[in-house]
From Swiss-Prot:
Family of this protein: Belongs to the HypA/HybF family.
GO BP: any one term: protein modification process
UniProtKB keywords: Metal-binding, Nickel, Zinc
Protein name (record): Hydrogenase maturation factor HypA
Binding site for Zn(2+): C73, C76, C89, C92
Organism: Shewanella oneidensis (strain ATCC 700550 / JCM 31522 / CIP 106686 / LMG 19005 / NCIMB 14063 / MR-1)
Positions with a binding annotation for Ni(2+): H2
Keyword Thylakoid: no
Pfam families the record matches: HypA
Record's function text: Involved in the maturation of [NiFe] hydrogenases. Required for nickel insertion into the metal center of the hydrogenase.
Molecular functions per Gene Ontology: nickel cation binding; zinc ion binding
Record carries keyword tRNA-binding: no
Length: 118
């Protein structure tokens, strides 16, 4: 299950941002997850809940925005947003398409807290 290694890298990235911003904890992690990223949202959530327990993200909530597939057809120039995992142009049924969005997983935003000054 590659979601474990993905979450491990995500938490490491969160820890680096928290350290750079003198944060004591991360309360929210927002990611954009493309439908063609190869990452299963439910497994990612489970992995996050497991791996966050020992670090600065232990109280963090993982928020996922699912990004549909966006393609552009080289034949008819149609740009399409697709819910299914298909690279066929819905306008002309061409396979000559280019993926514009929906293949990656991106860290979009972190909410962090800093220690209160005494």
């Amino acid at each position: 299950m590659h979601e474990y290694s993905i979450v491990s890298a995500l938490i490491e990235q969160c820890e680096q941002y928290a350290k750079a911003n003198q944060a004591t904890k991360v309360t929210r992690v927002e990611i954009k997850l493309g439908v063609m990223s190869g990452v299963e949202p439910a497994l990612l959530q489970t992995a996050f809940e497991t791996f966050k327990l020992d670090g600065i993200c232990r109280e963090a909530k993982l928020c996922m925005t699912l990004q549909p597939l966006v393609i552009k057809c080289a034949d008819c120039q149609q740009e399409s947003v697709l819910d299914e995992r298909s690279i066929v142009c819905p306008a002309c049924n061409s396979y000559h398409t280019r993926v514009l969005d929906g293949e990656e997983m991106l860290l979009m935003q972190l909410e962090m807290e800093q220690a209160e000054d005494a």
